């Protein structure tokens, strides 16, 4: 397939002396990926202007339609710390995931000498899955597939630091099983950096 994943992985395995992966005959065939995603977020916040310490809660509902992914989702994020950014939370790796654009001029990325902030966050997202190309297989060609779970949830814990216009965040994401017969649930880390100017 056009992504050249096999060639890239074989190159690294040859370079490092690792055994080559043997599942490439079962990968998805070339197919354009199209996904339209809509998400609505609502924020409630409480911040002490003297200490800059505060907390907020951000709820969300959403919908994705496409051959790569079709699902409904809902969830929330809670943040607590100093100089919370005036944005809509920290997203892990996903389509349309970056939402850290400041929403006002008092965001710590803009405020004079106090251009720093530090906060912890916890979030969850639950999805009702209609289609997942990585589990259901290609849309128009016969390919391998597995029986997917209809409901999948993510929970995340993380920390974010803001200095000047930069924001560095780390999250550890815990995901429930995505298909029947899956040995265990997944956990992965997400490190992101953004800069506002």
Set out the residue ranges of the language-model regions.
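Secondary-structure boundary elements
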Residues: 39-55, 68, 82-86, 161-166
């Amino acid at each position: 397939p056009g992504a050249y994943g096999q060639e890239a992985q074989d190159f690294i395995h040859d370079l490092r002396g690792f055994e080559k992966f043997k599942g490439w005959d079962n990968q998805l065939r070339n197919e354009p990926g199209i996904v339209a995603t809509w998400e609505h977020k609502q924020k409630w916040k409480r911040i002490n202007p003297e200490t800059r310490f505060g907390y907020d809660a951000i709820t969300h509902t959403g919908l994705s339609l496409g051959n790569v992914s079709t699902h409904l989702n809902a969830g929330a994020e809670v943040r607590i710390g100093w100089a919370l950014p005036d944005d809509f939370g920290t997203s892990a790796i996903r389509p349309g995931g970056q939402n850290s654009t400041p929403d006002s001029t008092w965001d710590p990325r803009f405020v004079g000498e106090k251009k720093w902030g530090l906060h912890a966050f916890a979030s969850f997202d639950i999805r009702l899955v209609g289609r997942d190309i990585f589990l259901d297989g290609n849309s128009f060609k016969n390919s391998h597939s597995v029986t997917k779970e209809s409901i999948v949830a993510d929970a995340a814990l993380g920390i974010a630091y803001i200095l000047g216009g930069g924001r560095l965040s780390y999250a550890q994401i815990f995901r429930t099983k995505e298909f029947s017969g899956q040995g265990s649930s997944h956990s992965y880390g997400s490190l992101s950096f953004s800069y506002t100017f």
